[in-house]
Design a protein with these regions (language model features):
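Conserved ABC ATPase signature
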Residues: 158-194, 201, 207-213
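Conserved P-loop NTP-binding catalytic core
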Residues: 1-36
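Short, mixed charged/polar active-site loops
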Residues: 30-32, 171-174, 258
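A short, sequence-level motif marking secondary-structure junctions
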Residues: 36-42, 59-62, 176-182, 264-268
């Protein structure tokens, strides 16, 4: 579980907690998971289930139901602690933990990731595992070649990776190291997406560093088709034309902190038919975005 990344510019201010709150629904049930922590440890943590607080942690003290206990590891989440001791998969604790632990995080710029489906597997092995599905997806892309990724053992019992390129009736086999960076990035992100369960969450930092603008549009369509929620950052204004106004947030960085403004709050009457990209580039939203 990666609730957030520490803002390293504020490491000296160790006593000021950073907080995250996640609202989500599973079937007809609503959950709110909250976490506040400093670099020294978790300060407070809670889980609300259908408006009732069923778990609350303050420092090392954890209250759950009618019992209280202590958690000695300062950075160990109470939700994980309780889920590890429960065998009832339908309990609110296990349902919440399963949902949150299946959130996949990808930094497309550095190719770093945190995804449950990739535990104990290399990214190459997961790409091979999802290769047939990736090829099926690429058939729907007009701007990307069709290929598969396969693995084989050489005479020294070392795993080698290859790329099968399809062009009409022709098949070409090349070492995967020959693949363009765009192909590698596309395969990597698609394999993570295809590994997520339905209603999963995918968080991508700087999506345009891994995907061509046209491929991003195809990727968003696939996310919608698979019923996955995607949270991503981007500097590419072209993407604004594909998103609903209430799903767009603008980030403004100042003095080491970022603030966020929802587009539909800035401009309540805006609709998808408006040219949001043009409005943004013409500085229509600047005053509201940069305001305190």
């Amino acid at each position: 579980m990666l609730p957030f990344v520490f803002n390293m510019s504020n490491v000296d201010n160790q006593n000021k907690p950073a907080s995250v709150r996640v609202h989500f629904k599973l079937s007809t049930d609503s959950f709110i998971y909250s976490l506040s922590t400093t670099i020294q440890g978790i300060v407070e943590e809670s889980l609300r289930f259908n408006k009732e607080t069923i778990m609350h942690r303050k420092g090392a003290t954890l209250a759950y139901g009618t019992s209280k206990t202590r958690i000695t590891a300062p950075l160990f989440p109470a939700l994980r602690f309780l889920a590890s001791g429960s065998i009832d998969e339908k309990s609110p604790i296990n349902r919440a933990f399963s949902f949150l632990s299946n959130i996949a995080y990808v930094n497309a710029n550095t190719h770093s990731y945190l995804a449950k489906s990739f535990q104990n597997k290399s990214s190459y092995d997961v790409m091979v595992e999802k290769s047939h599905q990736i090829r099926s997806v690429l058939k729907e892309y007009n701007s990307f070649p069709e290929y598969e990724i396969v693995a084989d053992m050489d005479k020294n019992n070392k795993k080698q990776y290859f790329m099968k390129m399809y062009s009409g009736d022709h098949l070409f086999v090349l070492p995967f190291s020959f693949a363009s960076q765009g192909m590698k990035d596309q395969s990597f992100i698609l394999s993570i997406l295809l590994s997520l369960p339905e209603n999963g969450v995918l968080v991508i930092d700087e999506i345009e560093t891994a995907l061509h603008p046209l491929s991003i549009m195809n990727f968003i369509d696939l996310v919608v088709k698979k019923n996955i929620q995607m949270v991503f950052t981007s500097h590419n204004t072209y993407i604004l034309s594909r998103l609903r106004p209430d799903n767009v947030f603008f980030a403004y960085w100042k003095d080491g902190f970022s603030t966020y403004r929802r587009l539909s709050d800035i401009y309540p009457n805006i609709r998808e038919v408006n040219n949001i990209e043009k409005m943004y580039l013409s500085s229509t939203f600047d005053e509201a975005i940069e305001g305190d």
